[in-house]
A protein has these predicted regions:
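Cys/His-clustered metal-coordination modules, chiefly Zn-binding fingers
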Residues: 54-125
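Long, charged N-terminal interaction/targeting segments
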Residues: 1-65
Length: 125
């Protein structure tokens, strides 16, 4: 599974939150043996580089790895009106984002307060 294919569930969840996203070719990709890279652009802002190591083989692990990277890049490098983007949002009563975790069958976005609330990555409302 390519970086683009593994990223598609993450892209769905960005779009569900009203954030436009695209991957652009990395102008400095480095050694091909190190894995695939792409530049992540969210709402018109280049937020950073995604990397997918060659050793990350299964689709669920690839998606989980990209989701965690994307979350760090969005929270660290994107703000709207001076406000940090808490993505992906948790319950409306929670003032924090969900976190990427490994589920039994699929990668999940999970509430960091106990983990009782979760949704598969790619199905965030």
């Amino acid at each position: 599974v390519s970086l683009l294919e593994a990223f598609e569930p993450v892209a769905h969840d960005l779009r569900a939150a009203g954030l436009d996203c695209q991957l652009a070719e990395d102008p400095n990709p480095g050694e091909p043996a190190a894995g695939a890279t792409a530049v992540l652009i969210v709402s018109g802002v280049k937020v950073g580089r995604l990397t997918l190591g060659a050793s990350v083989l299964d689709t669920a692990s690839r998606t989980l790895y990209l989701a965690a990277q994307t979350q760090r890049l969005v929270q660290g490098n994107l703000s709207i009106g001076g406000r940090v983007i808490e993505w992906p949002p948790c319950l409306p009563s929670h003032a924090h984002p969900m976190m990427a975790t490994r589920g039994q069958r699929a990668p999940l976005w999970t509430c960091p307060l106990g983990g009782e609330v979760s949704v598969p990555i790619g199905q965030h409302p």
